[in-house]
């Protein structure tokens, strides 16, 4: 059997066939590109000679494929060149389009110009970091004697302090109410130091640099004209961008519901904004911004990489999403670092909710500034309350990486972001229903108890307006506005900031509509300065309902550290609440009234169809004026909208 010739021939013939089945197509293409037939060592001339002797030419089609295969080989060899050519043509076309758009109407093309500058900055930073990064780090490395460097740093700190004192003395001569806000910062910092876990271990470098960065950011946004205009423009672009939510929500719910029902008007914005943030995470833009902000705080304040990344991430994401950035490192973080993570979550708001608050009519510039300024302040005050006394494993940023998510493409990233927001929207809706119902019940119960002892109108808001009035005054709010601001602070602390911002928007709408300031003993609106400071003070998740959210989120990531989280959560909540108050005080120091003065004589002598804040101010000035500078027609215009004793004459 073994010597059977037929079997031997069969085994010889099947062996090369079996090997050829592994990748016949690849062998075929490689052979053609080399100018040979598969499994043949003959040259093309020898093959053609053998074909001429044979009857048919079975491989005549292979010659027809050779030009295409050679073209493919050429493209492979010069792929990088083709990419550069394509990129160059694309950049040339975009540059020409941008140039033409700017020449035709620069204001119309401003958004495109800014986006182009952002992209160029991003690409330029990557290129410079790759080419000059090591050289710049060596150049910027401190040189000289350590003691000399120490005295140099102390001299800079002293100069900065003296400059701040000089600036305050000159600036507050025009607006003395700024001194109250400065005193508020001193009081809140002293209170937090008194509550510190380890008084002797406080890193005053972290505290001073954190408050200094907060001041510089506030100075850039609030006081300087270019910074204010830039953030005002950014807020307007965000408002316009969020208005596109109406297209989707109107299609799903209908025009009538979107126009009149709060849930269908505001909550879809959270879905849209969450979708956009998810896409930005997928392309890496969010990670780049977070890393740059974290790097700035780390090199100045001397904090660790993980805690700094978490606080920087809180500018854009919520208290439960920011810890996901450092999830692999939570198990090994010290208690001080975990305290920073919690404080950062309580001291800021999520980017998706930022869009919802802007839709209420809250000032977008103040919201954006509050979110950015809160990050260094949260890091500083957290290190004041819970200083580092352990050895951290994350002193340097090497080995700490940010993920880009699990999405494989932009469509999946957008879909995932929208799906994740459903839980957030449902949570907000459920909390609003529950908290507003509880608040109404508490007010009814307090009113019932107050009636028994002849106290009329007793409510939760009234109690807060008395208890928290000194806190509102320390922020720099005028005393007549303090009851309303204290009421909003109480709602934010004991219920949530969503309800408080809703109430603040109602006060703002009344002011803009030109409503009378007082109706009986009840104030109908507050000043613009009080609105801005309240916007800063409410910008944070520091309320008692967030304790369960924070503990639940962190415990789900690191179950073995549940006792550590429970140990410091109340301290972090208190610190986060104080961060928002210090943020408001900083805004009070830097706030400056803007806008041109209204010419009341010209305004009141025109035909008025509706009231406004400017008309109310002018009419109040006309009613209180003792000089006959306002014409009877101007007073008649005012009497159409407001009641005054002069109108009865």
UniProtKB/Swiss-Prot annotation:
Glycans are attached at residues 605, 643. Changing residue 546 to A/C/R/T: No effect on localization to the apical plasma membrane. Loss of pyrimidine- and adenosine-specific:sodium symporter activity. Probably due to sodium uncoupling in the nucleoside translocation cycle. It is a multi-pass membrane protein. Changing residue 510 to C: In allele A; affects urinary excretion of uridine and cytidine; changed N-glycosylation; increased protein degradation. InterPro entries: C_nuclsd_transpt, C_nuclsd_transpt_met_bac, CNT_C_dom, CNT_N_dom, Gate_dom. Due to its high apparent affinity but slow transport, adenosine could act as a negative regulator of pyrimidine transport under some conditions. Keywords: Cell membrane, Disease variant, Glycoprotein, Membrane, Symport, Transmembrane, Transmembrane helix, Transport. Pfam families: Gate, Nucleos_tra2_C, Nucleos_tra2_N. The chain crosses the membrane at residues 81-104, 110-128, 148-167, 179-195, 202-222, 262-283, 295-318, 338-360, 367-386, 424-446, 458-479, 535-558, 570-592. It comes from the Eukaryota. Belongs to the concentrative nucleoside transporter (CNT) (TC 2.A.41) family. This is Sodium/nucleoside cotransporter 1. It comes from Homo sapiens. The gene is SLC28A1.
């Amino acid at each position: 059997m073994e010597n059977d010739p037929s079997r031997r021939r069969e085994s010889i013939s099947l062996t090369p066939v079996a090997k050829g089945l592994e990748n016949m197509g690849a062998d075929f293409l490689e052979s053609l590109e080399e100018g040979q037939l598969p499994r043949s060592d003959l040259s093309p001339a020898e093959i053609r000679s053998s074909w001429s002797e044979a009857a048919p030419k079975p491989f005549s089609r292979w010659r027809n494929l050779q030009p295409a295969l050679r073209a493919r080989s050429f493209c492979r060899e010069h792929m990088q060149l083709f990419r550069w050519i394509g990129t160059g043509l694309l950049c040339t076309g975009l540059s020409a389009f941008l140039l033409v758009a700017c020449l035709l109407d620069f204001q119309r093309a401003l958004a495109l110009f800014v986006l182009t500058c952002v992209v160029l900055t991003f690409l330029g930073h990557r290129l410079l970091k790759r080419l000059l990064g090591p050289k710049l780090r060596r150049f910027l490395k401190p040189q000289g004697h350590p003691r000399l460097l120490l005295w140099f740093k102390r001299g800079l700190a002293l100069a900065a302090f003296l400059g701040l004192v000089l600036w305050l003395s000159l600036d507050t001569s025009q607006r003395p109410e700024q001194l109250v806000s400065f005193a508020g910062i001193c009081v809140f910092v002293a209170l937090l130091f008194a509550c510190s876990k380890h008084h002797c271990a406080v890193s005053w470098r972290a505290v001073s640099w954190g408050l200094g960065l907060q001041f510089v950011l506030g100075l850039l946004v609030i006081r300087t004209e270019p910074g204010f205009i830039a953030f005002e423009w950014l807020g307007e672009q965000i408002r316009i961008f969020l208005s596109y939510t109406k297209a989707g929500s109107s299609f799903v719910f209908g025009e009538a519901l979107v126009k009149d029902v709060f849930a269908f008007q505001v909550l879809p914005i959270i879905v849209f904004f969450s979708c956009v943030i998810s896409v930005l995470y997928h392309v890496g833009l969010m990670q780049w911004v977070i890393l740059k902000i974290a790097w700035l705080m780390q090199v100045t304040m001397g904090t660790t990489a993980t805690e700094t990344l978490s606080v920087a991430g809180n500018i854009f994401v919520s208290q439960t999403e920011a810890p996901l950035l450092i999830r692999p490192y939570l198990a090994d973080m010290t208690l001080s670092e975990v305290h920073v993570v919690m404080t950062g979550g309580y001291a800021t708001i999520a980017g998706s909710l930022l869009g919802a608050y802007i839709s209420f009519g809250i000032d977008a510039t103040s919201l954006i500034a509050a979110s950015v300024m809160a990050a260094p302040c949260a890091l500083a005050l957290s290190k004041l309350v819970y200083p580092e006394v352990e050895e951290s494993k994350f002193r340097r940023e090497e080995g700490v990486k940010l993920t880009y998510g699990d999405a494989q493409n932009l469509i999946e990233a957008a879909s995932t972001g929208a799906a994740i927001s459903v839980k957030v929207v449902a949570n907000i809706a459920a909390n609003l229903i529950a908290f507003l119902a509880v608040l109404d019940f508490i007010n009814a119960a307090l009113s019932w108890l107050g009636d028994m002892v002849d106290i009329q109108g007793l409510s939760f808001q009234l109690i807060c307006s008395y208890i928290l009035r000194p806190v509102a005054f320390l922020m720099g709010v005028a005393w007549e506005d303090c009851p309303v601001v204290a009421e909003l602070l109480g709602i934010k602390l004991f219920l949530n900031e969503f309800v408080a911002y809703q109430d603040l928007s109602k006060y703002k709408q009344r002011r803009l509509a030109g409503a009378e300031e007082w109706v009986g003993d009840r104030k109908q609106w507050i000043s613009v300065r009080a609105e801005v400071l309240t916007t800063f003070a409410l910008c944070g998740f520091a309320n008692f309902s967030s304790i369960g959210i924070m503990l639940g989120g962190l415990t789900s990531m690191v179950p073995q550290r549940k006792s550590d989280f429970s140990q410091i959560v109340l301290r972090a909540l208190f610190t986060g609440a104080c961060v928002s108050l210090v943020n408001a005080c900083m805004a009070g120091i830097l706030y400056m009234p803007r806008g041109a003065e209204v010419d009341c004589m010209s305004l009141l002598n025109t035909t008025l169809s509706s009231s406004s804040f400017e008309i109310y101010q002018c009419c109040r000035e006309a009613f209180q004026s003792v000089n006959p500078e306002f014409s009877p027609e101007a007073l008649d215009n005012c009497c159409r909208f407001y009641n005054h004793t002069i109108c009865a004459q």
